Amino acid sequence: MPVFLLCTFLMIILYPIGIDLYLVAVPKIADALQASEAQIHTAFSIYLFGMAATVLLGGMIADRYGRRWVVLGGALIFVLASLVAGHAEGITQFYLGRFWQGIGAGALYIMTFTVLRDVLSQERLAMALSMINGVICVIPVLAPVLGYLILSHFDWRGIFVAMALVAAVSGLVNLLLLKETRPARQPGSGAAQPFALLRSPRFMLLSLLTSASVTSILVYVSVSPLILMKEFGFTTEQYSIVMMVMAGVSMSTSFLTPLLLRWLGKQKVLAVSHLSYLLAVCSLLGSWQTGGDIHLLLPGFALVCVGFSCGFGVAMGEALDGCQHNVAFASAVLCIMQISLSGLYIWLLGQLGFTPSEMLICALLLALLSYLAVKGLLPWLALREARSQG
């Protein structure tokens, strides 16, 4: 298990590094490319579009030809794309590099869940995903610091060289240590019909559950600077301190989740996760109704972090359960649903004029409704399937 944890950790870190490492250099990139900061920030959406546009194809290739091809290919693409973006002379070339970075990061993102699902039992999978999530929580805190250190010695292009080096290390370690994990295909396993998953009510319900949880955490990340700095008047330094504390809450919860799983079991941990969301809603509503009470707001933020950190790995493991011969395709579908739902939600509520606090509260309510749908409908679906087979 330690070898697979190392390999998959090096796979999944490319996704957040591709987002967080270059943010401190946005003004310098804008000046160098003679672009507006808004154009540079558009590269974030292009990066996510690159991920979403290719993960289905990557999943099908992995299910048909093996996981190593996708892992090594994704790492190589990320290396080359980072160098393209780092040597850009104009915004178009920068966009091109960011798009292909997204392709490489997306391939390695879905392979993280795929490889772990291949080699671990359902119980150990939830624990492993929680541990990986705990390490990943540190990256948004450390990446700006690392970016600042790079900028203190090199220009902004050095950041993309650093991204390329991280991807090269990831590819090399996986080349040397990662063995092929794709299960042998068996007649009648359904491996040739990956789209059959989309007709599975159980899989789609659990996909909605994971997507609603991802939407909640991404909305929290998106609106927290607006709430704290614009509404409460926090300085950049004060905001950074709060985010470091929240990252610590997320990391601590993620590392404690394996113990909770042994003690309570998966279903109770999932219930604790959504109880945290419910308490977060109450805390945020209290802050909102009192005209902005920071002593209610910050515990609400912490509860959002707790809910996501202890529940996401369990929900992902449940969604991938039973997808043994199409697990890479299933991981790709989950990735697309999570990106699409969160992006659509943030865009739609922004267009409708919702305030940042309202957006976060509604996202948490969506997660709670998804959980209630899963708890109410899955037993009924299992009973219906048992009757049809009997």
Give the location of each predicted region.
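Paired small-residue
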Residues: 77-84, 92-101, 295-303
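C-terminal transmembrane helical hairpin of 12-TM major facilitator-type secondary transporters
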Residues: 270-312
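Helix-breaking motifs and short loop linkers at transmembrane-helix boundaries and internal kinks
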Residues: 34, 66, 87-93, 104, ...
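C-terminal membrane-cytosol helix-exit motif in multi-pass small-molecule transporters
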Residues: 164-184, 373-377
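Conserved MFS/SLC helix-loop-helix module at the cytosolic interface between two early adjacent transmembrane helices
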Residues: 53-92
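Helix-to-loop junctions at the C-terminal end of transmembrane segments
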Residues: 55-66, 253-267
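Juxtamembrane intracellular "pre-TM" segments in multi-pass secondary transporters
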Residues: 179-206
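Cytoplasmic helix-loop-helix junction between adjacent transmembrane helices
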Residues: 97-138
